[in-house]
């Protein structure tokens, strides 16, 4: 059984937050839940996390293999033939949400999220938007879903895709682009330092700390919420007993103060869902995101 065996956790992409999450899960399982199995974290990077799911499904029905799940698990198969859809894996948990921040240079003439939207409603190409790391990635989706809700023609946006948050920050600070869209956490130091000014956040409520004064889209009149979520999946073919085992593990792990405090420190929203709830969530994500990607011509 799992209790007296070894577990392999697959880290899905070369992002610091993913590696931190995988290793924190490993640490808490051993130290706080007292689970008596050996565990290891294996990095299977590349292909928008698709390689990790190929590796995972080489072990069908084996509950000793689990992987972090991210939004590209949903959008990747819509855009790239041959990627494994989420329906071919076993959803095990939704762990937390990470919200997206919209920011401008401190002296920008764009004063608010509403100001940003109104400029784009008049002319969708009037404002340059820097986002990482790819079209159909979380920052792009947070942008187009909010602007679509606001009545902007999202097919005509002037989007600049860069390699990472640091490049977005440099572009805005240097005056090369008008608005940057990245994880809220990556903007904190520059907002605190007075170099950037937040104009909107994609969450259901305001964030803490440096983002306490940054309103949500909903506060500014646009009914849009977007989360860059993290979860856990297992391979296809897991049994009800195996799923129940991991439901118990993750429900207990996500209630520990260590898990919740670390999430809040990183501006993450520790929203836990069990296997059945996660499956319904992923199905709903697939429908919502397919519609906007088809509109953009990025999926069929």
Question: Which residue stretches match the model-derived regions?
Answer:
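A ligand-binding cleft/hinge motif common to bilobed small-molecule-binding domains
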Residues: 68-81, 144-151, 178-212
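An extracytoplasmic/periplasmic, membrane-proximal ligand-sensing/linker region
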Residues: 240-300
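Short, well-ordered junction/capping motifs at the entry into regular secondary structure
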Residues: 1-5
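Stable alpha-helical elements in mature extracytoplasmic
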Residues: 17-21, 25, 48-52, 71, ...
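N-terminal (or domain-start) structured segment
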Residues: 6-88, 126, 135, 152-178, ...
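Short coil/turn segments
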Residues: 14-16, 71, 105-110, 132-137, ...
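C-terminal lobe and pocket-closing loops
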Residues: 186-255, 284-287
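Hinge/capping helix and adjacent helix->loop/strand transition within the periplasmic-binding protein
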Residues: 28-36, 55-64, 77-167, 217, ...
């Amino acid at each position: 059984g799992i209790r007296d065996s070894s577990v392999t956790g697959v880290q899905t992409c070369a992002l610091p937050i993913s590696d931190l999450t995988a290793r924190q899960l490993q640490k808490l399982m051993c130290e706080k839940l007292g689970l008596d199995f050996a565990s290891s974290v294996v990095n299977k990077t590349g292909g928008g996390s698709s390689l990790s799911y190929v590796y995972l499904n080489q072990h069908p029905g084996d509950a000793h293999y689990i992987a972090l799940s991210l939004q590209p698990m949903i959008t990747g198969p819509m855009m790239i033939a041959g990627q494994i859809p989420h329906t071919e894996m076993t959803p095990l948990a939704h762990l937390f949400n990470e919200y997206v921040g919209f920011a401008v240079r401190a002296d920008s003439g764009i004063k608010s999220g509403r100001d940003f939207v109104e400029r784009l409603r008049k002319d969708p190409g009037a404002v340059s938007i820097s986002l990482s790391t790819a079209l159909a990635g979380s920052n792009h989706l947070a942008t187009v879903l909010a602007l679509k809700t606001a009545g902007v023609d999202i097919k005509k946006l002037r989007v600049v895709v860069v390699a990472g948050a640091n490049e977005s920050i440099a572009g805005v600070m240097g005056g090369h682009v008008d608005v940057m869209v990245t994880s809220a956490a990556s903007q904190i130091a520059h907002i605190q330092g007075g170099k950037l000014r937040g104009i909107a956040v994609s969450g259901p409520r305001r964030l803490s700390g440096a983002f306490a004064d940054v309103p949500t889209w909903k506060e500014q009149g646009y009914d849009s919420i977007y989360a860059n979520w993290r979860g856990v999946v297992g391979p296809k073919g897991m049994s009800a007993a195996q799923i129940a085992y991991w439901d118990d593990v993750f429900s207990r792990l996500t209630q520990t103060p260590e898990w919740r405090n670390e999430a809040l420190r990183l501006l993450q929203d520790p929203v836990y869902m069990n296997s059945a709830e996660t499956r319904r969530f992923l199905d709903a994500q697939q429908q919502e995101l397919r519609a906007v990607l088809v509109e953009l011509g990025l999926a069929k």
